Amino acid sequence: MYRLYWLDEHNPRSPFPPAEQAMDEPNGLLAVGGDLSPVRLEQAYRRGIFPWYGPGQPILWWSPDPRCIFRPGWLHVSRRLARRLRTGAFRMSLDTDFTGVISACAAPREDQAGTWIVPEMMHAYEALFELGIAHSVECWDRDGELVGGLYGVALSGAFFGESMFSRRSDASKACMAWLSAQLHRWGFALFDCQVSSPHLRRMGAVDVSRSRFLAQLQQALVLPHRRGPWRFDRDLDPVAIHRQHQTRTTAPEVLYGS
């Protein structure tokens, strides 16, 4: 019988149990407690583990099976999204307003009872941003209003998406497309989305087993690390990059492993 592992909140370097020991129900719950220090968070991400909990709960650590991922540069860009990206409806930026993005992601939504991005979580990722490990993508309209964004953590050749928001149609999709294209150009090997959703699957995300994800993560972690702040390349064309890959018929098992 599996026993839930309790982490020492006074020792951020105390080890996590192997991700393979996560519970089946609830899917992926691995450990409780600890802290949200940069040392602890980096250790978690390197092991395929992330924090996710609500107000009034202790810190909960997860590694679900299966895992939802993209291969950078292989998102599905619809014709409608391609038109939005090429007409100049949005202005995109990287690492320009991290606090604005995470605050918008934490705001209550109509389809949710509450938010899991509690204040201590926000402060923890803002600390990672100051260290150049966490990053944000911003989507601005023509009036200069922040209308979409996402944030996540980058270690070596792996990017771990945490949350995104959209106040205009296609704004969060634009963030995904631009970030995926830039990660592809930089040679990133893995874009982790944690848990699958219909929205992510429509954009080309796939579910892989936890064991496959952990193997791909270890391969990505040997690649060079790119510390922030990041900026988009001036000549980046996300539509061209993704369309180039969409014209190929590469099977998912070739892209992501069987």
Swiss-Prot record:
Domain of life: Bacteria
GO molecular function, one term: leucyl-tRNA--protein transferase activity
GO-annotated biological processes: protein catabolic process
SUPFAM superfamilies tied to this protein: Acyl-CoA N-acyltransferases (Nat)
This enzyme's EC code(s): 2.3.2.6
Keyword Nucleotide-binding in annotation: no
Short name of one Pfam family: Leu_Phe_trans
Keyword terms: Acyltransferase, Cytoplasm, Transferase
Main location: cytoplasm
UniProt keyword annotation of Phosphoprotein present: no
Catalytic activity: N-terminal L-lysyl-[protein] + L-leucyl-tRNA(Leu) = N-terminal L-leucyl-L-lysyl-[protein] + tRNA(Leu) + H(+); N-terminal L-arginyl-[protein] + L-leucyl-tRNA(Leu) = N-terminal L-leucyl-L-arginyl-[protein] + tRNA(Leu) + H(+); L-phenylalanyl-tRNA(Phe) + an N-terminal L-alpha-aminoacyl-[protein] = an N-terminal L-phenylalanyl-L-alpha-aminoacyl-[protein] + tRNA(Phe)
GO cellular component: cytoplasm
Subcellular location(s) of the protein: Cytoplasm
Chain's role: Functions in the N-end rule pathway of protein degradation where it conjugates Leu, Phe and, less efficiently, Met from aminoacyl-tRNAs to the N-termini of proteins containing an N-terminal arginine or lysine.
Protein family according to the UniProt entry: Belongs to the L/F-transferase family.
Protein name (record): Leucyl/phenylalanyl-tRNA--protein transferase
Gene name in the database record: aat
